[in-house]
């Protein structure tokens, strides 16, 4: 006969038939909460769903974004606008104080200001300044830090109310797991007290919304996130070191290139559509932050108003090997420049 076991290992106030939570999810959320210094972290089934769920939780009457805010978030919200009562405002830059102030004035509350820090285009937002101004108008700020992960960017520390991250990228790091997260500051505790239609017995407001959306992180993904956190520091340092070498080489070769200074994501301007097809090693996929290097071409003028660009995600391979693949893809000599840059780096 089996011994008596208590299978109800998760706080029953946050559990409904073990669907919204289980031990793996609860454990990983607690790890992330401590790392962010957050009031609460909600593990989601993807980064995009984390963004959508955060918006569903706040239910803004005004959403303010800028030209570099994650494209899928903006497209999805504009699609939703057909049946929700919300004003959508897109400005050129959240760092433009006058433009942001103008958009906040007379905006309907709740107001949610959304940005990326850093963005695909290597711009680090002044989160402290943006959040301070937004709070003067009773607005909340949400920043996506997926481009460099929580290892390098934690907007909560600079006054943001919400941080959303795609753990599919650097945190899991292998391109084989879908997961995302919402980190909430103390300022968002009101979300658990707000009224929700048809509340779920035993669940507070936040988990009721998460449950209703079907945004359920599975135990294996939670485990992958937790495991990824163990090696995140080592991997991020390697991504950064290799990407810095390659960025400096491309810049010295007079190629239009942008890099935030952290992580492995590099953006190149003016590449032809067949550029990504020339690689022998770089894989053409629409993600980044993986152990393997990949490239992704997109026509950014369609939504970023910035022209044609290609994102290179520098993986954990030997940068000597990677620069040779980039050299043959660009069809310009880079090796000697690379050796010079590498030598200068060693001297530093």
Predicted segments — roles?
Residues 3, 178-180, 264-266:
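Structural beta-strand/beta-sheet cores of well-ordered domains, especially the beta-sheet scaffolds
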Residues 32-36:
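A short, N-terminal amphipathic alpha-helix
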Residues 251, 256-342:
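Conserved C-terminal alpha-helix-loop-beta "cap" of PLP-dependent enzymes
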Residues 1-23, 28-31, 311-313:
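N-terminal "arm"/small-domain region of PLP-dependent enzymes with the aminotransferase-like
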Residues 40-257, 338-343, 347:
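Conserved PLP-enzyme active-site core in the AAT-like
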Residues 23-27, 45-49, 283, 321:
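Generic alpha-helix structural propensity
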